[in-house]
């Protein structure tokens, strides 16, 4: 019998979407990973002088999905962003800067992963895993709290696998006390006006949709394409202390004019 506390979660970067690869990194902050195999069946109802609902059933297609909850770390958050947004080229050194932006004129190049979870002989991988929804959340408290990340992923399918022998990595959790929040006028310079002694917490929700491409001759999808982002699907919620700074922000919102 598997013991979930002995599970580990590993990832490997795929070259071809849906083609399994060996895992190359153990994710260090995972709290839970819930697999969801998607297998569709079709019942065929015919007039046969019977009240039975159907006489034949066939597999009609499949895919895979997963829900992932993790503690945000400076090292592993890159897996999440590149799976959701695109693979970024870092610049600088100590710290590195990685620019992430919503797609505009071209389809993004997102990170496809073989996402593996299990222990002993009970090991399964989501092939072609990408993140479609991600929520980052942190809240100041009496004890400094960590940032949490929740993700919804889709992939080609779940398949049996084996875990590779990978070592733990040293990671650094992202804490609420590490954050700074800036709010600037539209058209101004981002990152200029700091909201000091004001922000108590935040929740940032990002959705980067993906659509399966399906072809004759295969139960499972053969690729992905990425439609435009929905305006209402990407949100930032702030918990703010009502002080003079916030008062002016509220006044500008309720006093808006065409």
Positions of predicted regions on the chain:
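Signature of extracytoplasmic/envelope-associated structural regions
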Residues: 1-258
């Amino acid at each position: 019998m598997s013991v979930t506390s002995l599970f580990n979660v590993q990832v490997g970067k795929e070259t071809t979407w849906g083609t399994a690869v060996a895992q190359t990194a153990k994710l260090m902050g995972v709290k839970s990973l819930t697999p969801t195999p998607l297998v569709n069946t079709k019942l065929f109802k015919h007039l046969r002088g019977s009240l039975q609902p159907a006489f034949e059933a066939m597999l009609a297609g499949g895919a895979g999905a997963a829900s992932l909850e993790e503690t945000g770390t400076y090292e592993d958050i890159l897996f999440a962003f590149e799976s959701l947004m695109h693979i970024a080229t870092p610049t600088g050194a100590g710290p590195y800067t990685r620019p992430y932006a919503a797609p505009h004129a071209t389809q993004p190049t997102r990170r496809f992963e073989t996402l593996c979870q299990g222990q002993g002989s009970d090991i399964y991988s989501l092939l072609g895993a990408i993140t479609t929804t991600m929520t980052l959340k942190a809240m100041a408290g009496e004890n400094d709290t960590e940032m949490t990340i929740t993700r919804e992923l889709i992939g080609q399918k779940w398949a049996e696998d084996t875990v590779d022998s990978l070592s733990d990595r040293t990671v650094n959790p992202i804490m609420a006390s590490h954050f700074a929040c800036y709010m600037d006028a539209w058209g101004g310079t981002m990152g200029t006006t700091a909201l000091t002694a004001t922000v108590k917490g935040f929740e940032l929700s990002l959705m980067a949709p993906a659509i399966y491409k399906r072809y004759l001759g295969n139960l499972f999808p053969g690729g992905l394409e990425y439609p435009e982002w929905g305006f209402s699907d990407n949100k930032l919620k702030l918990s703010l202390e009502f002080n003079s700074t916030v008062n002016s922000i509220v006044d500008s919102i309720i006093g808006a004019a065409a």
